């Protein structure tokens, strides 16, 4: 842990600066607003000590701490001892104390609520913890999905180890993930079953959550007869779309080794192939969180193949986050920037793009019109019109 510097007599340092002729340093120090300087130091210390939060979140997901609190009922708060009692085979007598310290940290980030009550005969206080509004996204909903798997993926060993190669990648080039593991992330999935399971779960959960919101808000699926989902995985996205628009014939397009595990879905045909070679014909093409995996050069190949597969007036429906051109300090801006640097570290040329960059890609691929339609759960639904 970082040690906060102290001085038995702060004026000694200032007097020494004056005696040594460093009056400029002395005057600068003397003129500082002590309260503002304290706040800056506190923020710097938070940055220096930020690793425990994501790691505690990962452990909370693995232990299902938030799920245990949720099971107790709406607005209920539980003590760390009560939560520890619900853990399987919790034989560690220190578990309640450890959980209390972890949950305290989560409370400082507004992930959980906390109420301190009188400890009675034991003295001190007993803290009870409940779910803050954001916590619902880390507890499985009625569809069995949450963002918990995304935390397990990003804080898992395979991705964490890659960050150790970031400095080397900046100085020498290359992708940190490839440098550490000796292969691209999509190839690595085939060598690590546990990583592959977590990766697929994280993608499925996030996609399930967002596609339902997209279908409710975006009206551009109307009048589509044949919709091709490029990189559609096991077809879950098309399942949601076609269940809301039964007249649509869905074509789930992905690599052959992916679609061979795809389940039978009414109204959906699974087609194997390579999007860099060709894409099945349709009057509309859907791509969600696909372009951000690839470099501009790769994206142009994909989009040009989309253009060839569309009739006149056909469209590509692109769902991606939009990078903000100037950095902001909002939660959304931070989330997108974090994902962007994550893509830089883990993927083969992937990046988050600004709206202007998406428009440039659309025009370079030959599309006549670029139309940002609506914003849904951190994502923009954009149409590239032929």
Swiss-Prot record:
Sites where the protein binds S-adenosyl-L-homocysteine: 207, 231, 254, 274, 288
Protein EC: 2.1.1.-
Pathway: Aromatic compound metabolism; Alkaloid biosynthesis
Binding site for S-adenosyl-L-methionine: 254
Entry keyword Repeat: no
Active site per the UniProt annotation: 292 (proton acceptor)
PROSITE patterns recorded: SAM_OMT_II (PS51683)
UniProt keyword annotation of S-adenosyl-L-methionine present: yes
Catalysed reactions, as listed in the record: dopamine + S-adenosyl-L-methionine = 4-methoxytyramine + S-adenosyl-L-homocysteine + H(+); 3,4-dihydroxy-5-methoxyphenethylamine + S-adenosyl-L-methionine = 3-hydroxy-4,5-dimethoxyphenethylamine + S-adenosyl-L-homocysteine + H(+); 3-hydroxy-4,5-dimethoxyphenethylamine + S-adenosyl-L-methionine = mescaline + S-adenosyl-L-homocysteine + H(+); 4-hydroxy-3,5-dimethoxyphenethylamine + S-adenosyl-L-methionine = mescaline + S-adenosyl-L-homocysteine + H(+)
Keywords, comma-separated and alphabetical: Alkaloid metabolism, Methyltransferase, S-adenosyl-L-methionine, Transferase
Function: O-methyltransferase participating in the biosynthesis of natural products derived from phenylethylamine, including mescaline, a natural hallucinogen potentially used in psychotherapeutic treatments. Catalyzes the O-methylation of mescaline para hydroxyl groups, using dopamine, 3,4-dihydroxy-5-methoxyphenethylamine, 3-hydroxy-4,5-dimethoxyphenethylamine and 4-hydroxy-3,5-dimethoxyphenethylamine as substrates.
Description of how the protein assembles with itself and partners: Homodimer.
Protein family (similarity comment): Belongs to the class I-like SAM-binding methyltransferase superfamily. Cation-independent O-methyltransferase family.
Full protein name: O-methyltransferase 10
Gene: OMT10
């Amino acid at each position: 842990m970082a040690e906060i510097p102290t001085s038995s007599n702060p004026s000694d340092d200032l007097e020494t600066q004056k005696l040594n002729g460093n009056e400029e340093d002395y005057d600068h120090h003397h003129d500082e607003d002590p309260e503002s300087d304290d706040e800056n130091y506190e923020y710097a210390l938070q940055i220096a000590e930020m690793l425990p939060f994501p790691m505690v979140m990962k452990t909370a997901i693995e232990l299902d701490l938030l799920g245990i609190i949720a099971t107790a009922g709406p607005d209920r708060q539980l003590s760390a001892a009560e939560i520890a009692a619900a853990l399987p085979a919790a034989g560690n007598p220190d578990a309640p104390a450890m959980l209390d310290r972890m949950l305290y940290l989560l409370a400082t980030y507004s992930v959980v609520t906390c109420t301190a009550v009188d400890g009675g005969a034991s003295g001190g206080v007993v803290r009870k913890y409940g779910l803050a509004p954001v916590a619902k996204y880390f507890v499985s909903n009625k569809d069995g999905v949450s963002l918990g798997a995304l935390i397990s993926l990003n804080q898992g060993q395979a991705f964490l180890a890659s960050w150790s190669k970031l400095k080397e990648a900046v100085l020498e080039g290359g992708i940190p993930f490839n440098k550490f593991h000796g292969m691209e992330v999509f190839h690595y999935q085939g060598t690590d079953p546990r990583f592959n399971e977590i990766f697929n779960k994280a993608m499925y959960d996030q996609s399930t959550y967002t596609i339902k919101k997209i279908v409710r808000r975006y009206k551009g699926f109307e009048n589509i007869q044949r919709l091709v989902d490029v990189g559609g995985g096991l077809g879950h996205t098309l399942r949601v779309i076609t269940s809301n628009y039964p007249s649509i014939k869905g074509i789930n397009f992905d690599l052959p080794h992916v679609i061979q595990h795809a389940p039978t879905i009414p109204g959906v045909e699974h087609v194997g192939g390579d999007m860099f070679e060709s894409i099945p014909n349709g009057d509309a093409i859907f791509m969600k969180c696909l372009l951000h995996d690839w470099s501009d050069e790769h994206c142009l190949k994909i989009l040009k193949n989309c253009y060839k597969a569309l009739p006149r007036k056909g469209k590509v429906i692109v769902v991606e986050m939009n990078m903000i051109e100037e950095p902001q300090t909002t939660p959304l801006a931070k989330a997108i920037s974090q994902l962007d640097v994550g893509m830089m570290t883990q993927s083969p040329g992937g990046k988050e793009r600004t709206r202007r960059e998406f428009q440039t890609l659309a025009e370079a691929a030959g599309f006549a019109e670029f139309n940002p339609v609506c914003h849904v759960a951190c994502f923009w639904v954009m149409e590239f019109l032929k």
